[in-house]
Amino acid sequence: NPDVAAQSLRLDGEELNLARVMVNGGGTSFKIDGNQLVLENLPEGNDAFDLEIFTTCDPSKNTQLSGLYVSNESFFTQCEAEGFRRITYFLDRPDVMASYTVTLRADAQKYPVLLSNGNLLEQGKLEDGRHFAKWIDPHKKPCYLFALVAGQLVAREQRIVSRSGKEHLLQVFVRPGDLDKTEHAMNSLMASVAWDEARFGLPLDLERFMIVATSDFNMGAMENKGLNIFNTKFVLANPATATDYDFASIESVV
């Protein structure tokens, strides 16, 4: 609010290792107050400035399954309601809307699939057997809708065409060996997308829509922007053993 006197910037953070803070490429004063990073003496006026915060965290020790965590040697996020503050210092409130550009780098054999919200802008190989993927979400969103996934996953894919003639890619990612259990989830996703467009005139606003299934997920389903993360019970259905209730549950959640 330009009519309010300048105040300290307080950013939420939990269980983070802070390396450094920079403003417009230079050092700046800060302090830690409980679970907040407090920045003072920021540039005055209404001019924008660049704030860079370098942090690390340990997802392998994150037993809360909130923020960035490891499940079966893969990385997942759960940011609702206040999990993003466990990834980096941020204004972790639902009224703060921002666009995100995310670059993921990892060992290509251990983590061949690198996902985040939005559209895949670029991907490629790096040195020492590593690779990268760069994602950009052009739509502003609260940080609790941020998502990240990295691991050994395979995908069922389906291309669809909206009423405007634009092509979109639908993907359902699962563990290797579970791909044959994803047909109903994909059919449910296609039906959901078609219904949104027919009923409300709302086509997909991204180039792709992704669902990822994991067994260690404490929310059942999390509808992150463009990258939904679901518990496997709401994605996987073996036609030989699943009940009508299982199929109905998948359709209702997807």
Where are these regions (language model features)?
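Short, hydrophobic/aromatic-enriched beta-strand segments in well-ordered soluble domains
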Residues: 1, 13, 47-62, 100-108, ...
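Short coil/turn motif common to extracellular beta-sandwich-like domains
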Residues: 2-8
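A surface-exposed beta-strand-loop module
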Residues: 6, 13-71, 128
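Aromatic/His-enriched, Gly/Pro-containing loop or helix-boundary segments
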Residues: 8, 22-45, 78-87, 232-253
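Generic beta-strand hydrophobic packing signal
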Residues: 9, 14, 19-21, 102, ...
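The feature marks proteins involved in alpha-glucan
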Residues: 70-80
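Hydrophobic helix-coil surface modules that form long, contiguous segments used
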Residues: 79-82, 90-252
